[in-house]
A protein has these predicted regions:
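Zinc-dependent deaminase catalytic domain
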Residues: 1-121
Length: 121
């Protein structure tokens, strides 16, 4: 991952569905906002100045006008609850992750209720 985070490097790739299935349509990694200083701001034990890999990947698609409807996400770590919600809301239908990381049962429930398939690789 290209992440500059010292604690955990996370990467995310989103691939298409349909006729152009499995083509990369967006990607992101966790890190500081573009153009912002790489200055850590921790509150309640969590970094506040960075954007999660999944969020950056969705922003990448949005900047380029790419629909994520029906797409699949490959991410290095189990998504946090906020990323799970925005991945579902953006039209993602499948999340495949490599490593367990603070797996939240509520995130699993929310994804299941919104018919998003969650698979550990």
């Amino acid at each position: 991952s290209r992440s500059s985070c010292e604690r955990l490097r996370v990467g995310c790739v989103i691939v298409s569905s349909g006729e152009q299935k499995n083509r990369i349509i967006a990607a992101g990694y966790n890190g500081f906002l573009p153009g912002a200083p790489h200055h850590s701001r921790v509150r309640d034990g969590h970094e506040q100045a960075t954007v999660h890999a999944e969020q950056n990947a969705i922003c990448d698609a949005a900047r380029r006008g790419v629909s994520l409807e029906g797409a699949t996400v490959y991410v290095t770590h189990f998504p946090c609850i906020n990323c799970a919600k925005i991945l579902s809301a953006s039209g993602i239908r499948c999340i495949k992750y490599h490593s367990d990381y603070r797996n939240d049962e509520l995130a699993k429930e929310i994804l299941a209720e919104s018919q998003v398939v969650l698979l550990k690789l």
